Amino acid sequence: MLGEQKEIQEVKNAYEAYEKINEIDPYDIEELKHIHGIMTKYLIDESGCFRHGEEGVFNGEECIFMAPPARFVPHLMEELFDWMEREKEEVHPLILSCVFHYEFVFIHPFTDGNGRMARLWHTAILAKWNPIFESGTPHSHYFSDELGVPIFFANLCDKM
């Protein structure tokens, strides 16, 4: 295989995590930590645990975003998951998954893997709503071979 060992491990971990997407309960915070443990296995010491230190996003030397202090992370994550559980029947899954993604990335609960986990969890929320987002679903049958028209999305728009 070509590539750095860390990159190869990231791909293996992501594959393993996405294989579980159909089994994930996206409203369970402990499951989020468990899947993070899979996503970051052999890559970081705090795999599967919320961060204990401060975290920011940097562009070279410049800090472009500073996450909330680590001491607030458990409470912020509980609030986010409580909100999702409470609103999952009232808020459309497309909106719910986007709000989750935004809030999750803002909270930045882990030392590493936040972007990967946000994308995976976003997909897990959507997979509970529609099978097109499930792992292993052949997406080709959602499209018209004759016209190249995205049938699934046209039907979705008709229902909204």
Model-assigned labels for residue ranges:
Residues M1-M160:
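FIC/Doc superfamily catalytic core
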